[in-house]
């Protein structure tokens, strides 16, 4: 589990440090979602937040418990959604950058430093940033962003499951599982599928 030890030395000179992460780069369907989270200076996690970790390591139930606690404890937070149509138009990397920047721009207060999960970022606002590979398993603020992005995306995919029941989006959330690929083979793609993501198994090029 994570503490704010990464942020602590940064808070000596900065009052607002913001973690950024995304969910949904790899699925065949649905949006990519990014979140930005900034905690109060010298914040120390207590209670349920002591269980925070990379969202991929947490159960869905624990993520659902953590999300409201993150929102309540954060000084500022925002989530941005970029749908499949835009992903197809500008590609998944550009769509991910767009979602991350939209999340930052939506924050109630402007950060002084961005801590971004991964190895690349293209900022829109003139804010210093640091990319951190596997940051969601190293940095508290990034892990918090990963949970907010993941829970929001999961909510959207569950809603899409009701709209497009043939695909089981509430089970695989758009990822290329055997069941999902079989559903595409049987029914074709629906409106939220990413047309630019091809399936070689189905002979798509």
Swiss-Prot record:
<dbReference type="GO" id="GO:0030145">
    <property type="term" value="F:manganese ion binding"/>
</dbReference>
<comment type="function">
    <text>Endonuclease that specifically degrades the RNA of RNA-DNA hybrids.</text>
</comment>
<dbReference type="Pfam" id="PF01351">
    <property type="entry name" value="RNase_HII"/>
</dbReference>
<keyword id="KW-0255">Endonuclease</keyword>
<dbReference type="InterPro" id="IPR022898">
    <property type="entry name" value="RNase_HII"/>
</dbReference>
<dbReference type="InterPro" id="IPR024567">
    <property type="entry name" value="RNase_HII/HIII_dom"/>
</dbReference>
<keyword id="KW-0378">Hydrolase</keyword>
<dbReference type="GO" id="GO:0032299">
    <property type="term" value="C:ribonuclease H2 complex"/>
</dbReference>
<feature type="binding site">
    <location>
        <position position="21"/>
    </location>
    <ligand>
        <name>a divalent metal cation</name>
    </ligand>
</feature>
<feature type="binding site">
    <location>
        <position position="22"/>
    </location>
    <ligand>
        <name>a divalent metal cation</name>
    </ligand>
</feature>
<protein>
    <recommendedName>
        <fullName>Ribonuclease HII</fullName>
        <ecNumber>3.1.26.4</ecNumber>
    </recommendedName>
</protein>
<feature type="binding site">
    <location>
        <position position="117"/>
    </location>
    <ligand>
        <name>a divalent metal cation</name>
    </ligand>
</feature>
<dbReference type="InterPro" id="IPR001352">
    <property type="entry name" value="RNase_HII/HIII"/>
</dbReference>
<keyword id="KW-0464">Manganese</keyword>
<keyword id="KW-0963">Cytoplasm</keyword>
<keyword id="KW-0540">Nuclease</keyword>
<feature type="domain" description="RNase H type-2">
    <location>
        <begin position="15"/>
        <end position="205"/>
    </location>
</feature>
<keyword id="KW-0479">Metal-binding</keyword>
<dbReference type="GO" id="GO:0005737">
    <property type="term" value="C:cytoplasm"/>
</dbReference>
<comment type="similarity">
    <text>Belongs to the RNase HII family.</text>
</comment>
<dbReference type="InterPro" id="IPR036397">
    <property type="entry name" value="RNaseH_sf"/>
</dbReference>
<dbReference type="GO" id="GO:0006298">
    <property type="term" value="P:mismatch repair"/>
</dbReference>
<dbReference type="GO" id="GO:0003723">
    <property type="term" value="F:RNA binding"/>
</dbReference>
<dbReference type="GO" id="GO:0004523">
    <property type="term" value="F:RNA-DNA hybrid ribonuclease activity"/>
</dbReference>
<dbReference type="InterPro" id="IPR012337">
    <property type="entry name" value="RNaseH-like_sf"/>
</dbReference>
<dbReference type="GO" id="GO:0043137">
    <property type="term" value="P:DNA replication, removal of RNA primer"/>
</dbReference>
């Amino acid at each position: 589990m994570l503490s704010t030890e990464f942020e602590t030395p940064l808070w000596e000179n900065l009052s607002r440090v913001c973690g950024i992460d995304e969910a949904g780069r790899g699925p065949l369907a649905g949006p990519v979602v990014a979140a930005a989270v900034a905690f109060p200076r010298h914040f120390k996690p207590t209670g349920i937040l002591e269980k925070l970790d990379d969202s991929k390591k947490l159960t869905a139930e624990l993520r659902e418990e953590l999300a409201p606690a993150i929102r309540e404890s954060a000084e500022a937070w925002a989530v941005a959604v970029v749908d499949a149509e835009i992903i197809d138009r500008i590609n998944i990397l550009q769509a991910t950058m767009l979602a991350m920047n939209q999340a930052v721009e939506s924050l109630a207060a402007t950060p002084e430093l961005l801590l971004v999960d991964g190895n690349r970022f293209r900022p829109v606002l003139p804010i210093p940033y640091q990319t951190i590979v596997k940051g969601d398993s190293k940095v508290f603020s990034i892990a918090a962003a990963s949970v907010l992005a993941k829970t929001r995306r999961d909510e959207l995919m569950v809603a899409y499951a009701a709209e497009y029941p043939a695909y089981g989006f509430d089970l695989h959330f758009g990822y290329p599982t055997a069941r999902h690929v079989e559903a595409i083979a049987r029914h074709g793609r629906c409106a939220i599928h990413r047309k630019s993501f091809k399936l070689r198994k189905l002979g798509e090029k």
